[in-house]
Amino acid sequence: MKQQEVRQRAFAMPLTSPAFPPGPYRFVNREYMIITYRTDPAAIEAVLPEPLQMAEPVVRYEFIRMPDSTGFGDYSESGQVIPVTFRGERGSYTLAMFLDDQPPLAGGRELWGFPKKAGKPRLEVHQDTLVGSLDFGPVRIATGTMGYKYEALDRSALLASLAEPNFLLKIIPHVDGSPRICELVRYHTTDVAIKGAWSAPGSLELHPHALAPVAALPVLEVLSARHFVCDLTLDLGTVVFDYLRQ
């Protein structure tokens, strides 16, 4: 294979059979359960990279079912998101995500910089209860519950929150182990169509794990529980801060 062909075909590894396809990345019937809780502000400050700033001492714990996604297929995901501000702009910082599908795991890390690891998340309805769980290996590290479709949510407020920017810390090492890329990335979700949205009483339980430390942001008080289904497009990102050029 000629050098020019290598350059033209270079998108993802392996060169001749990339682990994930090019976008756009459209998600249909994407289902969320989000438990928002109050936590220790010092715990957030210990994991939040500058120049992001904590908006408030809360965390959104997410369980997500994605049954129909372009190129990525059918999978589930779970993790923690922190409300932040960046130079006066309000948004969200994804601290950690766990999922059960290789293409979005590789694509999420390599393209955007999502902090993804392999895990076993689930989001299921058990009679009148929506139940989310996350196992890391044989260990259950998160369990969330909420009533099933108790009260309709304000869709305009939900759409506004989904339109806010999201921030990621993308880190890729050089071949000698030194940092090659260390960037703050901003991305948006677009073309959002909400198909249903509800609130209900909710609960969240987190358990310590050495390699999946979701419990490092402890649950002090559950503030809200939201369940919604939507279609959306996951746009590619832009670099807003380069740590290696400062």
Curated annotation (Swiss-Prot):
Catalyzes the conversion of acetoacetate to acetone and carbon dioxide. This is Acetoacetate decarboxylase. The active site is at residue 116. Belongs to the ADC family. SUPFAM superfamilies: Acetoacetate decarboxylase-like. It comes from the Bacteria. The record marks 117 as: Important for activity. The keyword Lyase applies. The keyword Mitochondrion does not apply. Homododecamer. Coiled coil: none annotated. It catalyses: acetoacetate + H(+) = acetone + CO2. One of its GO terms (molecular function) is acetoacetate decarboxylase activity.
